[in-house]
């Protein structure tokens, strides 16, 4: 096979060389009948052309025939070759050339093997060609296009040492799946199911009597039987399956919810283990990782959240558990062994569900557990901190951040004053870094509420909070900058005048940049801060310090901004400063005009100096080195 390939390549080289020596005599090449490579002098182009064409056609037939024969016997000998492949190391190297007159042999694979000693011999189990006819076997190539332009193409089932590596052109012409698309432009994969339920094998239920139809002494036993019925898990991915039994389970859940809500004196100590078991079997299940996150793909907001098909049963199970926790007869001291850390960890993992309805009921459930089980409070806060830290620094994929922050806001509201050092560390290490994520818009209202609660509890934290917000202030994300400006206004509602002095200079430097923004909504939101009376009063008390910082941006915006509405608002803010202290304002305007004049003079001098340098450079003759 190697000999036939070398003949075939040499014939191609002969054809190429003959094309490069038209209308002249030169040293020519031909292949004799015995296959030897012969050089002759002064052979005419026409004779050599016909002979090389004939040899090329003949060698093409030999080559294709050999390939077809090997394709037939390749699978039959695959078992024998498996034992040989353990000792054989085959490396294929393809060298490509971009010139038309290059040697075609550079495209051939280089075979390195420890067992094939003579490279001119055929590989083991490779059949030798018997005839030159290949026309009857051309149809055996269903997936390969054979043409005169692709003599070296081989079928997909050829040995690895005969398959050439793809060239850059082949990669370019390949399918779209081989194109290296940026990650931010790739479509976000959607998961089909938010969770996986362990469907019960026996799913046939019998309707039990209602609580009103039995004696009072038998209601507790009936309650337990209904709970056992509700332990059966149905397949809601098939809407047409077990319709009657699904309805029986839903009715049983509704009856138990009404029974717990309307009756007092229920022995919760004996029933609560059964309720926890039913809750665990129905609610706790694996949640798929969040794939449709909003960290990099803003267009993912158009995607509808996945709603749990089993929600008709899930909702009632949640409500039953919540009703039990809210029952006046419930005693948390007797349920500590049931609602423990492991139970809470499984409950916390469910906050990653994509269904907002379930996250809402999870939030209520966690509220009740935090209020009832005092021994778990520290562990609950620590576990929530871990979720936030993982979201910030690792994967930024978790659906329930907003709900957890809402729970945390009510927890912070109940903190005792003065705040513990643990809570201050949580503010600086967790809450403030939550501003840096790309998906902050999903939970920003809840985050702002937590920040405001901390400042309200301890005003001395104002400087640390505002410094952290300025640290993570967005530079190119206008939508995120609007959120930060809204948060600044909310913080001013609880800001102490004594604390404002410590942070006003860096804060107003950032406000000046926002006022100068070409995004009209950002500029408008920054200017509208002066519509807040408390904000304006704090500014008036420190106008001497703040006006020099903010005036250049206000002046440029009022005169140069592309939006006429923004220009009008900027003029109104300037008028507010005039009303605060007209004398200081007029003096500042004069100083600003003088500074502008000096700046223009400096620019004129600089321009003149550059003109002089250009004139001197034009007078100098170019040196030999520059030539």
UniProtKB/Swiss-Prot annotation:
SUPFAM superfamilies, alphabetized: ARM repeat
Subcellular location per the Swiss-Prot or TrEMBL entry: Cytoplasm; Cell tip
Keyword vocabulary terms for this entry: Cytoplasm
Principal cellular location given in the protein's record: cytoplasm
Listed InterPro entries: ARM-like, ARM-type_fold, PP2A_B56
Annotated region (Disordered), positions in chain: 1-37
Gene Ontology MF, one: protein phosphatase activator activity
GO cellular component: cell division site; cell tip; cytoplasm; protein phosphatase type 2A complex
GO biological process: deactivation of mitotic spindle assembly checkpoint; meiotic sister chromatid cohesion; negative regulation of septation initiation signaling; signal transduction
Subunit structure: PP2A consists of a common heterodimeric core enzyme, composed of a 36 kDa catalytic subunit (subunit C) and a 65 kDa constant regulatory subunit (PR65 or subunit A), that associates with a variety of regulatory subunits. Proteins that associate with the core dimer include three families of regulatory subunits B (the R2/B/PR55/B55, R3/B''/PR72/PR130/PR59 and R5/B'/B56 families), the 48 kDa variable regulatory subunit, viral proteins, and cell signaling molecules.
Family: Belongs to the phosphatase 2A regulatory subunit B family.
Function description: The B regulatory subunit might modulate substrate selectivity and catalytic activity, and might also direct the localization of the catalytic enzyme to a particular subcellular compartment. Has a role in cell shape control and septum formation.
Protein name: Serine/threonine-protein phosphatase 2A 56 kDa regulatory subunit delta 2 isoform
Source organism per UniProt: Schizosaccharomyces pombe (strain 972 / ATCC 24843) (Fission yeast)
Lineage of the organism: Eukaryota, Fungi, Dikarya, Ascomycota, Taphrinomycotina
Gene field: par2
């Amino acid at each position: 096979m190697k000999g036939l390939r070398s003949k075939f390549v040499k014939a191609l080289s002969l054809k190429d060389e003959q094309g490069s020596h038209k209308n002249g005599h030169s040293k020519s090449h031909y292949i004799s009948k015995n296959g030897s490579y012969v050089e002759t002098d002064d052979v005419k182009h026409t004779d050599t052309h016909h002979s090389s064409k004939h040899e090329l056609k003949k060698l093409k037939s030999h080559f294709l025939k050999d390939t077809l024969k090997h394709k037939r016997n390749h699978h039959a000998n695959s078992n024998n070759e498996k034992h040989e492949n353990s000792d054989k190391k085959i490396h294929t190297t393809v060298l490509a050339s971009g010139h038309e007159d290059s040697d075609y042999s550079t495209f051939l694979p280089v075979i390195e093997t420890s067992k094939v000693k003579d490279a001119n011999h055929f590989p083991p189990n490779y059949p030798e060609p018997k005839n030159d006819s290949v026309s009857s076997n051309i149809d055996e190539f269903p997936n390969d296009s054979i043409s005169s332009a692709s003599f070296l193409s081989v079928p997909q089932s050829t040995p690895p040492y005969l398959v050439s590596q793809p060239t850059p052109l082949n990669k370019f012409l390949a399918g779209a799946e081989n194109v290296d698309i940026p990650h931010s432009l790739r479509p976000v994969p959607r998961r089909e199911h938010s969770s996986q339920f362990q469907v019960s094998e026996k799913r046939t239920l019998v309707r039990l009597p209602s609580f009103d139809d039995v004696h009072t002494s038998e209601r507790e036993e009936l309650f337990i039987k209904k709970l056992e019925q509700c332990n059966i898990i149905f397949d809601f991915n098939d809407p047409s399956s077990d319709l009657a039994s699904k309805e029986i389970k839903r009715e049983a859940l509704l009856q138990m919810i009404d029974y717990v809500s309307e009756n007092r004196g229920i022995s919760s100590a004996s029933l609560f283990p059964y309720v926890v078991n039913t809750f665990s079997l129905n609610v706790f299940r694996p949640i798929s990782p969040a794939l449709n996150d909003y960290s990099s793909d803003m267009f993912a907001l158009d995607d509808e959240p996945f709603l749990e098909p089993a929600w008709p049963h899930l909702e009632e199970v949640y409500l039953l558990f919540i009703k039990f926790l809210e029952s006046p007869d419930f005693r948390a001291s007797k349920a500590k062994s049931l609602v423990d850390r492991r139970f809470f960890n499984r409950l916390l993992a469910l906050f990653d569900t994509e269904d907002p309805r379930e996250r809402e009921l999870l939030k209520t459930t966690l509220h009740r557990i935090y209020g009832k089980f005092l021994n778990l409070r520290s562990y609950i806060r620590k576990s929530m901190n871990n979720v936030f830290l993982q979201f910030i620094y690792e994967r930024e994929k978790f659906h329930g951040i907003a709900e957890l922050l809402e729970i945390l806001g009510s927890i912070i509201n109940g903190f005792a004053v003065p705040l513990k050092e643990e809570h201050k560390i949580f503010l600086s290490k967790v809450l403030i870094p939550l501003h840096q994520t790309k998906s902050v818009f999903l939970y920003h209202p809840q985050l702002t509420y937590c920040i405001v609660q901390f400042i309200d509890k301890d005003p001395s934290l104002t400087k640390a909070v505002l410094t952290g917000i300025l640290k993570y202030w967005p530079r190119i994300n206008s939508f995120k900058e609007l959120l930060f400006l809204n948060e600044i206004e909310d913080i001013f509602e609880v800001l102490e005048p004594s604390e404002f002095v410590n942070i006003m200079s860096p804060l107003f430097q950032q406000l000046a940049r926002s006022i100068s923004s070409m995004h009209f909504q950002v500029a408008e939101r920054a200017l509208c801060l002066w519509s807040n009376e408390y904000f304006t009063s704090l500014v008036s008390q420190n106008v001497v310090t703040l006006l020099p910082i903010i005036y250049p941006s206000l002046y440029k915006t009022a005169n140069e901004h592309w939006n006429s509405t923004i220009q009008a608002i900027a003029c109104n803010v300037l008028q507010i400063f005039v009303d605060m202290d007209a004398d200081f304002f007029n003096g500042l305007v004069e100083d600003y005009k003088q500074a502008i004049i000096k700046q223009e003079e400096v620019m004129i001098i600089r321009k003149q100096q550059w003109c002089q340098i250009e004139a001197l450079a034009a007078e100098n003759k170019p040196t030999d080195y520059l030539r």
